[in-house]
Amino acid sequence: MQSWVNKLWYQSHPLRFALWPLTLLFGAVSWLRRLLFSLGLKKATKLPVPVIIVGNITVGGSGKTPTVIYLIELLRSHGFKPGVISRGYGVEIEGVRSVLPEDKPASVGDEPAMIVSRTAVPMVVGAKRVDAAKHLLAEFDVDIIISDDGLQHYQLARDIELIILDGERRLGNGMLLPAGPLREAAWRLKSVDQVIVNGGIAQSGEQAMLLEPSKWLPVSPVHNGSLPPSQSQPLVAMAGIGNPQRFFDTLQALGYCVEQAQAFDDHSAYSETALNELANGRLLAMTEKDAVKCRDFAKDNWWSLAVDAKLSPSFDKQLLAKIDRLVADK
């Protein structure tokens, strides 16, 4: 299914024209909804702390989660106490709930489980981001909120908007859903504080971001000491993210011998049986987001590759300066 959609959105597939009427309808509804908020006919809830939205205008993975982790670490290093809110994609959450280190991705979502596992940040998930943000402020000592996704969730007033763009895919065929991958039209890029480009070539006015591999982590929490992958050792690679090929290309660029590469749909659920069959006793390499879903049944020779987002000092300086102004005005 995902490969078919990729052909439709990122290649010149003729079916996109058949979907044009639905795209017009989607665009009209999206425009009207934004207009109601901009005119004040629908009210956005303002919070007593700065709110940073990390989102995108395309469907699928673009690098939001590594960016959120980068911001958490940046803000902490400058004395802030960040908290994070998220929808918890792919799970049904009644009301809101705090994300705990022991929570399973099936209960809170893949990205929230990974973010809390990596950073131990205070985090709340819920379909209504305003409610999630209020719960976060009530339950935790937080002085700035990062919203993982939620660019189109206009009920929550925001102080800073960051769009993360896949530098290789960019806007695909440039069409709105369902004919293309866009949640909002391309003009939205000009209305945000920063457009962060993950990989590829950043255009004028955009911020370049690199995802740098940092280290191999054992998937199993009771790892028994097997060695991490080496370039001379054949491995099986798997990825269930927005752009699996990016992970496979990274492994090959690092010099690893990828004997087999298996792409899964984003947010796929994994079974012990299926992954045992895939690995067949061989070393299995996966992304951090996949790893949080495999811990309960992982074998000793299953490893995940941690990546760190890297942004320029000028980005950090501009962002922190704006946050300081916001804090002074709150």
Swiss-Prot record:
BP term (GO), one: lipopolysaccharide core region biosynthetic process
Catalytic activity: a lipid A disaccharide + ATP = a lipid IVA + ADP + H(+)
Main enzyme class: transferase
Gene Ontology molecular function: ATP binding; tetraacyldisaccharide 4'-kinase activity
HAMAP family, per database record: LpxK
Role this protein plays: Transfers the gamma-phosphate of ATP to the 4'-position of a tetraacyldisaccharide 1-phosphate intermediate (termed DS-1-P) to form tetraacyldisaccharide 1,4'-bis-phosphate (lipid IVA).
UniProt-recorded name of the protein: Tetraacyldisaccharide 4'-kinase
Organism of provenance: Shewanella pealeana (strain ATCC 700345 / ANG-SQ1)
Gene name tied to this protein: lpxK
